[in-house]
Amino acid sequence: MTISPVSHNTRPESQLLPQEAAAFDLLDKLGIEYDRVSHDAAFNMELCAEVSRVLDVSVCKNLFLCNRQKTAFYLLCMPPDKPFHTKDLSAQIGSSRLSFAPEESLWELLRCHPGSATILGLANDTEHRVRLLIDREVCDAPFFSCHPCICTSTLKLKTADVLEKLLPHTGHTPVIVDL
């Protein structure tokens, strides 16, 4: 995988996809500073491990989930090395067994494609149909990482900015879980 060896604190100068431009616009509007690295598409956590080294941050694993009926949707932000057990998480949040949500729902609700699910996509969930679940370990870390709605770039944000600026703006209150 090709990764830019240099991180930047500005948006890319190249042409951006609409959802990517909207993510950077939101960060600018909220005064949230970030470090950014560009890279080849990172569709799995093994590739993201290389990005972690460049940005000096643990890249979050973001899973877009739903209940069996596909009536409740969840974005789970968790450490990359923690195992995910649907039964345990379902019990913590009082939901029926969870599974991965359909690709169409990911696009409809967060304006993201598979591999690029991100907390920044919650800005597109204006009807608040997605519940945000964050593992306690992620909340306790000083920095938070995510894609800007596209999997060819990764951002390093202050966790405090995510919790105190971004989420109040989107209107999503995180549910803290212990995986």
Residues covered by each model-derived region:
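Extended, low-hydrophobicity, polar/charged segments
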Residues: 1-179
